[in-house]
Amino acid sequence: MSVTPSIDAVRDLRAASCGPVGAPSVTSELSENIILTSLDDLHNWARLSSLWPLLYGTACCFIEFAALIGSRFDFDRFGLVPRSSPRQADLLIVAGTVTMKMAPALVRLYEQMPEPKYVIAMGACTITGGMFSADSTTAVRGVDKLIPVDLYLPGCPPRPEAIFDAVIKLRKKVGDESVSERIKIAQTHRYFTVPHQMKRVEPIVTGAYLSADTQKAALSPGAGLPMAAELNTSEIDASPASQPSSTYES
C-alpha cells in the first residue's frame, strides 16, 4: 500500500532541490578517487618518471652502465630511455676519463641539451681524474670544471646497483623542485662557456742538452775506444747487401 505525500512535503522537497547550489562537501568516497595536487608536483612527477639519458662513455665505467640495459637489472622501470641525440635528452651521464681534446665536445653536447637538464658524474676518473690525475698531462681533473654536475657517483668503477641509487637520488631532487624557483635560479645562476684562449708553447726538450759542455765531458773518456764492427758505418755502406740490385730473379 503506497502512501501519498502531503502538499507540504512536496513543497519542502521542491524548495530544497531548486534552491541555490551550496558548497559541495568532500566525502570519503570522493577523496579516494580524486587526487588533489599542485602544478609543481604534477610537472615534477611527469619529469622524474621520464628521464632520458645521453650516455657519454669514454672508459671502463661505461661498461658497468651498459650492464643496466640488460634484463638482469631492467633500468626501464625508472623510465630511462637512452637517446643518441642531446636535443632529445635531459640527463647527461659522463662515465670515464675526460681529456683535454674531448672537453670541447662534451661542453657542446651539454649546451645542446634542452632545459631542464641534469648531469651525473660517474666514476673516479670523471670526478677527480682518478689514476690519471697524477702523471697525465691531458686528463681533466674533474668534469665539474667544464659543466655543472648535479650528482657525483664515486667508484672505480661503480656497480650497477650504485647507478640505481644515483638515479633514485636524482629523482628525489627533481621531485623537490619548483617551477617558479627554477626560473629565478636560471636568471641568476646562468652557465656560460668559457672560451679557452690557447697559445703555442715551445717544447722544453729540444735536444740541445746533447751539445752541452757537461755532456761532452761525460762522453770524452770513451772517444778513443775502438768501435765494434757492427757499428762501423763505413763498412756497412760498402757491403754488397746495402747496394741496390739492378737485376731481378724469377
Swiss-Prot record:
Predominant place of localization: membrane
Q: Tell me what topology the record assigns in the membrane.
A: Peripheral membrane protein
| Record GO terms (molecular function) | 4 iron, 4 sulfur cluster binding; iron ion binding; NADH dehydrogenase (ubiquinone) activity; quinone binding
Q: What class of enzyme is it?
A: translocase
Extract one GO cellular component term from the record. respiratory chain complex I
Residues annotated for [4Fe-4S] cluster binding in this entry: C60, C61, C125, C156
SUPFAM superfamilies the record matches: HydA/Nqo6-like (SSF56770)
Ranges for the region named Disordered are 230-250
Q: Where in the sequence does UniProt note compositional bias of the Polar residues kind?
A: 231-250
Q: What cofactor is this protein dependent on? A: [4Fe-4S] cluster
Recorded hits in PROSITE patterns, A to Z, give: COMPLEX1_20K
Location in or out of the cell? Cellular thylakoid membrane
Cofactor binding note: Binds 1 [4Fe-4S] cluster.
List the PANTHER family.
Answer: NADH DEHYDROGENASE, NADH DEHYDROGENASE [UBIQUINONE] IRON-SULFUR PROTEIN 7, MITOCHONDRIAL
Q: What does this protein do?
A: NDH-1 shuttles electrons from an unknown electron donor, via FMN and iron-sulfur (Fe-S) centers, to quinones in the respiratory and/or the photosynthetic chain. The immediate electron acceptor for the enzyme in this species is believed to be plastoquinone. Couples the redox reaction to proton translocation, and thus conserves the redox energy in a proton gradient. Cyanobacterial NDH-1 also plays a role in inorganic carbon-concentration.
Similarity comment text for this entry: Belongs to the complex I 20 kDa subunit family.
Record note on quaternary structure: NDH-1 can be composed of about 15 different subunits; different subcomplexes with different compositions have been identified which probably have different functions.
* Protein name stated in the entry: NAD(P)H-quinone oxidoreductase subunit K
